[in-house]
Curated annotation (Swiss-Prot):
UniProt-listed SUPFAM superfamilies: Protein kinase-like (PK-like)
Similarity annotation: Belongs to the pseudomonas-type ThrB family.
Record bears the keyword Amino-acid biosynthesis: yes
Catalytic activity: L-homoserine + ATP = O-phospho-L-homoserine + ADP + H(+)
Protein name: Homoserine kinase
Pathway membership: Amino-acid biosynthesis; L-threonine biosynthesis; L-threonine from L-aspartate: step 4/5
PANTHER family assigned to the protein according to its UniProt record, in alphabetical order: AMINOGLYCOSIDE PHOSPHOTRANSFERASE DOMAIN-CONTAINING PROTEIN, AMINOGLYCOSIDE PHOSPHOTRANSFERASE DOMAIN-CONTAINING PROTEIN-RELATED
Taxonomic source organism: Chelativorans sp. (strain BNC1)
The organism's place on the tree of life at top rank: Bacteria
Amino acid sequence: MAVYTDISEEELTAFLRHYPVGKLLSYKGIAEGTENSNYLLHTTAGAYILTLYERRVDRSDLPFFLGLMEHLARKGVSCPLPVKRLDDGLIGELAGRPAALITFLEGMWMRRPTALHCGQVGKALADLHQAAEDFPLKRPNALGPEGWRRLWEGAKARADEVEPGLAREVDAEFALLERDWPKDLPSGVIHADLFPDNVFFLGGELSGLIDFYFACNDLLAYDLATCLNAWCFEKDISYNLTKGAALLAGYQAVRPLTREEIEMLPLLARGSALRFMLTRLYDWLTIPDGALVKKRDPLEYLRRLRFHRQVRTASEYGIELA
């Protein structure tokens, strides 16, 4: 979450007249994240998250994102729900941008997740994959391999400013991933961004998943590989085998991986690391000065990518092989 667009109290009050949420009491911007402008609202009816969609979010994708939240909630997945307007729509407009009001989910994200947290995340991800199996809408992954290439074309010219030799290294990585990327593994709806700040806990128990604005249809094991990258590396970018084993075991307790998925896990983890390195690099070079947003270091994911290059089998991630 982040803030790119400032809004006035008058604008917000007028916007809220179209929702059954009472009167505005207070609001404040949320700085974490990189994609949309987000505000925490308190009204006489409760707490809500207001999201203004910008940057990489296409308005035509909003029915997928918001509909997915409704679908998952009906299937028992704990996640926020979009608030219906008085005209029964889900999408309004504020400050010239599409906007939606979302229910507030109780909990806190874990700054220092343990293996116990990772096990719960693995299970929750598998639950999400199964719950979304009959979701009728489709959305291709705009940040799959073709999307990585477009990002790279926008950042390559200045890449060596961030890390000497980065352009050559990433070009070599593209050559391998574009040649070997799997296309026939089990696929379905994936979250695609299940980082620690998108998972809430209460009293040590997972209380819900948030931020579905990268959700799409893609390889299920790629979603799991993204979680390995997001949850199982320490601050010094060393891989925590105990966390990895817990995350993978939690996932497989609900949805066992196929032999082919297990074999491809190192390559999928490389692709995931490249994807997040590229979006961080692009944002590092292009986010406007003065935006209330935290830039994230692309080199953290370059170091993950280098780790995955050395992995020969998925057993090195902590998965139990039959």
